[in-house]
C-alpha cells in the first residue's frame, strides 16, 4: 500500500484556516496517483476527496483550503450535495498567482528583457547605489518590525501576535533548509532596510516575503531584489512563483516582471 494523497491542515477554534503567507494549502497527491490513466482519475479523486470531506464536516465548524494550480478539477466539491436545495454547498472562488518559467529563459539576460520598462529603469539606477547596502544575518524581530511597518493597517493587536508566530514559523522552515533568506542593512544606519524570503518545493521557488522600508522602496530596491532572485534560481528550478496576484496593485506589480497568470481555487464550506 502507498499513500496517494495527504492533506495538511491548521485548526483554530475548530475551524480549518489557511496560515498567513501560505498558498495552495490543501491536498497533495503522489505522482503515482496523478499519472494514472485519465479514465481512472475522476473515480479515484472522488473517492479520496469524499473521505476527507466527510471527516472535515464531522470534526470542524468551517472548511477553508486552496488547490494548487495543477489541480483545476473542482467538480467533486461542486457536486457535493448536488441538487439538494436544503443542503449546504461548497463555495468555490477563482484565485490567481503569477509565475515565471525559469526554464524558458535560456540565458540570464532574457530574464530582465521581459520586465516592464519601469522595472528595468529602477534596477539600472539602483545598481549605482547598491554599495550603500551590506548583507546581514536574519533576525526574526527585525524582520517582523520591518514587515509590520509596511502592513500595520492589516493587523489588529491580536493578529500582530499571530503574525509574529507565522513569520517565526516560516523562518524555522528556512533554517531547516526548505528555503532561503536574504537581508540587507543600510551601511550608515546599520538598520535592516530590505529582506526577502523564499521557500522551495521540488520544481518551484516561492516568494513568500519581499519587504523594504519606504525610503529604500522608492529607490527601486524591490525590483533589484526580485531580479537578484530570478538570476540566482535560473537553471535551478522550473518555476518562480510570486505566491498570489489577487489585488489590482499587487497583481500589476508582479506581472510587471513578465509573469504569467496561474488560476487556482480557494474552496470553503
Label every PLM stretch briefly.
Residues 1-15, 69-217:
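A conserved beta-strand-loop-helix scaffold within acyl/acetyltransferase catalytic domains
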Residues 11-26:
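Conserved acyl-donor/pantetheine-binding loop and adjacent beta-alpha core of acyl/acetyltransferases
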Residues 58-69, 233-243:
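Conserved GNAT acetyl-CoA-binding A-motif
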Residues 55-59, 126, 133, 174, ...:
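Alpha-helix C-terminal capping segments
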Residues 172, 176-269:
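Aromatic (often tryptophan-rich) hydrophobic motifs at membrane interfaces
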